[in-house]
Regions:
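Extreme N-terminal starter segment of soluble prokaryotic enzymes
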Residues: 1-4
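Short glycine/proline-enriched coil/turn segments at helix->beta-strand junctions
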Residues: 56, 106-109, 229-231, 275-278
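Active-site/acyl-donor-binding loops of N-acyltransferases
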Residues: 67, 110-170, 216-217, 235-329
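Beta-sheet entry/capping signal
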Residues: 50, 62, 79, 109-112, ...
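Amide-forming acyltransferase catalytic core, primarily the GNAT-like/NAT-type
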Residues: 7, 11-64, 69-72, 127-253
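Conserved acetyl-CoA-binding loop-helix of GNAT-fold acetyltransferases
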Residues: 87-105, 261-273
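Long, hydrophobic/aromatic-enriched structural stretches that serve as scaffold segments
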Residues: 60-98
């Protein structure tokens, strides 16, 4: 018989062990990630750390909850992100009661997913959630064709299509210096330049606690891009894509401030130089898509299904949810 119960930060050790069996990642790296999640400044007592399924006192499924604060410039709402949703192959039926436990939070908090696959997307859809427009694709720009061509050949002729990802994603290469795009290593200096949310849609609340935890405690760094026309803060995520992790990819996670349309080409060139990128991209649901000057340098790459889903049955966000890639874990 499957038993469902709520999780707390005290369950980190068994959770790390379970997720290790499901993902192939090491316990220490997962433990570190879970400990970081437990330090979430948006956490509140009403929202547990997650939910788990047990069979004969054996952990066989789990989902982690990540509260995130969103603001429309005047009001603040807590939304709950679902991540690390895994169920052991021997008890696939445990996924539904776990999701139902999570869904009960929707009475008070909007719920969302940021990296849904086809299976979880069907689950979200069946329980009344809707996909966020644009999340079914990403924008990509190929900077170096050879690693992309190698991936095409590998996918076409290689027998193994699903290698396990490494525990940590190394940066594509040693970063180079760039006079216009520079790292801001001091969190306090970065916090002074972040503007508050403007009235309008509910976007991720950019308060000091969130920026410090979500970016700097995670080992990331904001970059400043400044020219005669532009002055903005940027967040990038470096990763290795491809069957053999041969593609040095840079995702543009956030751009805060003013990026002048005339600087779009230079901005992309600075990213390519700084990170020696083979591929640059950003999510289709990102506010960056509003810049025609930026998107014309990119092509759309379609996903198998929408990646971002929202469940807000009581319209707490007034149908004005603005997705941010930084809101996804």
């Amino acid at each position: 018989m499957i038993k469902i119960r709520e999780l707390s930060a005290g369950d980190i050790e068994p959770l790390a062990a379970f997720f290790s069996t499901q993902t192939g990642m090491s316990r220490p790296s997962l433990r570190s990630r879970l400990e970081w999640l437990a330090r979430n400044p948006a956490s509140i007592l009403d929202i547990p750390f997650g939910v788990a399924a047990y069979q004969s006192d054996q952990l066989c499924g789990a989902m982690i909850y990540v509260p995130m604060r969103f603001s429309n410039g005047t009001a603040v709402r807590t939304c709950v992100l679902s991540i690390l949703f895994y169920v052991d192959a021997s008890v696939r039926g445990a996924g539904v009661p776990m999701f139902l436990a999570y869904r009960r939070l929707a009475k008070q908090y909007p719920l969302f997913a940021a990296t849904a696959n086809q299976s979880s997307a069907r689950l979200w859809s069946s329980f009344g959630a809707h996909a966020i427009a644009g999340s079914e694709f990403e924008y990509v720009k190929v900077c170096h064709a050879l690693p992309i061509l190698a991936e095409f050949i590998l996918r076409r002729f290689s027998r193994s299509q699903n290698p396990q990802p490494p525990d940590t994603q190394p940066p594509p290469s040693t970063q180079r210096s760039d006079q216009k795009l520079v790292p801001i290593t001091d969190p306090e200096a970065a916090l002074k330049t972040i503007a508050p949310s403007e009235p309008g849609s509910y976007g991720l609340l950019r308060d000091p606690q969130m920026v410090r935890w979500k970016i700097y405690e995670r080992g990331r760094t904001l970059h400043g891009y400044r020219t005669e026309r532009s002055d903005c803060l940027c967040l990038f995520q470096c990763s290795r894509r491809g069957t053999r992790f041969q593609i040095a990819a840079v995702d543009i996670i956030e751009v805060w401030g003013h990026l002048d349309p005339q600087d779009s080409s230079n901005f992309i060139a600075c990213i390519q130089r700084l990170f020696s990128a083979d591929l640059i991209g950003f999510r289709g649901a990102s506010p960056l898509t509003k810049s025609d000057a930026l998107t014309r340098h990119f092509r759309r790459r379609k996903f198998p299904c929408p990646a971002v889903w929202l469940m807000d049955p009581n319209a707490l966000l007034e149908n004005r949810f603005e997705y941010s890639a930084l809101a996804g874990e």
